[in-house]
Every structure is written in structure tokens, then in C-alpha cells.
From Swiss-Prot:
Keywords associated with the record: Cytoplasm, Methyltransferase, rRNA processing, S-adenosyl-L-methionine, Transferase
Disulfide-linked positions: none
Catalytic activity: uridine(2552) in 23S rRNA + S-adenosyl-L-methionine = 2'-O-methyluridine(2552) in 23S rRNA + S-adenosyl-L-homocysteine + H(+)
Residues engaged in binding S-adenosyl-L-methionine: G58, W60, D78, D96, D120
Record organism: Methanococcus maripaludis (strain C7 / ATCC BAA-1331)
Compartments reported by the entry: Cytoplasm
UniProt xrefs under Pfam families: FtsJ
CDD domains: capping_2-OMTase_viral
GO molecular function: rRNA (uridine-2'-O-)-methyltransferase activity
Protein name in the entry: Ribosomal RNA large subunit methyltransferase E
């Protein structure tokens, strides 16, 4: 075992939330992030209908189930197969949340439009700041777009974002679709992590504007004829050319801002 591996193992052994999650049979330490976010912002209530985007390995599904109880309902979507949870009101679908057929499958399972959309998904981390920031923005904008398609009016939204040059622009974009937008970092997030959570409270019912002048929307790959959005990061495949293009866009926006 190398030094990095030993350091990682030691870090996990000393990680309060990792040990707590293991003790209480939660699949991820991230479970406690959702508990803390909900405690602060009152996003999810008992009996709510919830959709979890990028739900693997299932930690947020477990947290949401603990909050909504047996009379709520939760559907998760992820590219990976998620091991079933022992609850009749929690279902995980394998698929791409940007695909209409997957969204239809989720909608068909739901008893009504969701009260809350949650997303703790992360793109593949390259270690290159601009690339990771761009991938994160692409993924979180996909989540926002999906939320505007599914949420009931007045519903809530929470998504993980990596900090960077365009972080505030993303928060501004969220505020266009919700009455209030907040940012926070729960106690369970590691101090060294660049992750921040963006909260949208009370969906105003607006449809996502793919022609928006927002610099965040311009980062997306679009089909100009059909206006369909593709998500290389969501498929966990992104070429060097795609990465370079996103970095170029971010640098151009950065220079304009300066």
C-alpha cells in the first residue's frame, strides 16, 4: 500500500461522519450532509415526494426516506446500478437524467409531481481546477434543467456545486427559477473540499430557457436544430477537446469580467 493509500485509510478511520454512517448502516457519509441541509433550510418534509438525481450509492436516498417516512415517496436516478433499499416507497432507476425516456419513467412511478429535487452528483475529478469547475457547472445545470421539468410549483431544489469563477453566476441562474437562492457548506463537508450546496426555495414554475444569455447555459453542448442538451460529464466520458473548449470558455468569461 502506497503512502497516499495509507493516508486515505487513516483519514477514513478518523472521519467522524464516515464512522457514524458505518455504525448506522448508511451507505455514505454524505447522508449527514442532507440531514444538515434539511435541518437548516427545511427542504424536505414528512410525506413529501422526492427525486434524487445521481443517487448512487444511495446515502441521500436513505436520508430522504428517514425524513419523508413511510407515507412519502422517493425515486432516484443514476447511471450506475443502485442496490435496492428495503423500502417499498424508494425506487432507483438506472439511466441518464437528461434523457426524456428516463424522466418519463420516473414520472410514471411518482404518485404526483415531486416536492423536492435533490442532487449530490459529482463529475469525474481530473485534478485540473478549470476542468473540474466546468464539469461541475455542466452537471449542476443539467440538474437545474431537470428540476424545472419535474418540480411542482413551490417545490425546493438542492444541488452540489464546485466553487470557481462562475459559481456566483450559477447561483444567479438558480434564482431565476426560485423565489430564493442560498449557498451553504454543511458541517459534514470536509474542510478541504471545494463543494458548496446551492439551495432553491419555492419553484416559480418557469421553464428552463436554453436560449438564456447566462454564461452558465452557454457552457452546455447543444444541438442547434433540436435544442437537445448532451452531457459528456453525466456519461462520465469527456474528451480532451471538450475539456479544452470548456476551459477556453471559462477563461474568456474571466477575462471579460476583469
Amino acid at each position: 500500500m502506497g503512502k497516499k493509500d495509507k493516508r486515505w485509510v487513516l483519514q477514513r478511520k478518523n472521519d467522524h461522519y464516515y464512522n457514524l454512517a458505518k455504525k448506522r448502516n448508511y451507505r455514505s457519509r454524505a447522508t449527514y450532509k442532507l440531514f444538515q441541509l434539511n435541518e437548516k433550510f427545511n427542504l424536505i418534509k414528512e410525506r413529501n415526494v422526492v427525486v434524487d438525481l445521481g443517487c448512487a450509492p444511495g446515502g441521500w436516498l436513505q436520508a430522504a426516506r428517514d425524513i419523508v417516512g413511510e407515507k412519502g415517496f422517493i425515486v432516484g436516478i443514476d447511471l450506475q446500478t443502485v442496490k435496492p433499499l428495503p423500502y417499498e416507497n424508494v425506487i432507483a432507476i438506472k439511466g441518464d437524467m437528461t434523457k426524456e425516456e428516463i424522466l418519463k419513467q420516473a414520472k410514471d412511478l411518482l404518485p404526483e409531481k415531486p416536492d423536492v429535487i435533490i442532487c449530490d452528483a459529482s463529475p469525474n475529478i481530473s485534478g485540473v481546477w478549470d476542468v473540474d469547475h466546468a464539469r461541475s457547472l455542466e452537471l449542476t445545470t443539467m440538474a437545474l434543467m431537470t428540476a424545472t421539468k419535474m418540480l411542482k410549483k413551490g417545490g425546493n431544489f438542492v444541488v452540489k456545486v464546485f466553487q470557481g469563477d462562475l459559481f456566483e453566476k450559477y447561483v444567479q441562474l438558480v434564482s431565476e427559477y426560485f423565489d430564493k437562492a442560498f449557498t451553504t457548506k454543511p458541517r459534514a463537508s470536509r474542510d478541504e473540499s471545494a463543494e458548496v450546496y446551492v439551495i432553491g426555495k419555492r419553484f416559480n414554475g418557469r421553464k428552463f430557457d436554453i436560449n438564456s444569455k447566462s454564461p452558465i447555459v452557454k457552457l452546455l453542448d447543444t444541438n442547434p436544430e433540436e435544442k437537445e442538451i448532451t452531457s459528456p460529464s453525466l456519461r462520465k466520458e469527456i474528451s480532451k477537446e471538450d475539456s479544452g473548449l470548456m476551459i477556453k470558455r471559462i477563461k474568456e468569461m474571466r477575462s471579460k469580467k476583469e
